[in-house]
Regions:
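Non-catalytic interaction/Regulatory regions outside core domains
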Residues: 1-145
């Protein structure tokens, strides 16, 4: 069941976004929620840790808390890559739980270089991980913020 609570955030306050941004963020989040097994999705600024928009989630999945926590996961991985002198970029990070997949997809398309990521939570019993990764890549390619 999709929670229709769609929120946009800027710093700690909810904001009204320009029409073009709103349509693109809203469309991307709604498309992500059509992925089989989707429980919740956020578009997150990993510089600040704040979510720009959430869809889904619920009582047991606070997407704002998850956004901040997953920002730390990304920062830790980037520090590790720097320590190892890896000249590469993170495409996505998968966290596998007993009942869920948590997929963190850093946005890399040329129109979107603001340090954003999509965070998607999937029910393991209903999700096809390979297909979900493919669909999230497609959503990323079309997203303009």
């Amino acid at each position: 069941m999709i929670n229709a609570d769609l929120r946009y955030r800027d710093d700690a306050k909810t904001r009204t976004v320009g029409r073009a941004d709103s349509v693109n963020i809203e469309t991307a989040l709604k498309e992500a929620m059509t992925i089989d097994g989707a429980v919740g999705v956020s578009l997150v600024d990993w510089d600040s840790g704040m979510s720009l928009g959430n869809l889904g989630g619920g009582k047991y999945l606070d997407l704002d808390v998850a956004a901040a926590g997953n920002t730390e996961v990304i920062r830790a991985k980037m520090r590790t890559m720097e320590s190892l002198r890896l000249d590469d970029n993170i495409e996505d990070i998968l966290i596998t739980l007993n009942k869920q997949y948590h997929l963190i997809r850093l946005l890399k398309n040329s129109r979107n270089e603001q340090g954003l990521f999509l965070y998607l939570v999937l029910d393991r019993q209903k999700a096809n991980l390979a297909l979900a990764r493919h669909q999230l890549r497609s959503i990323e390619a079309e997203l303009v913020v």
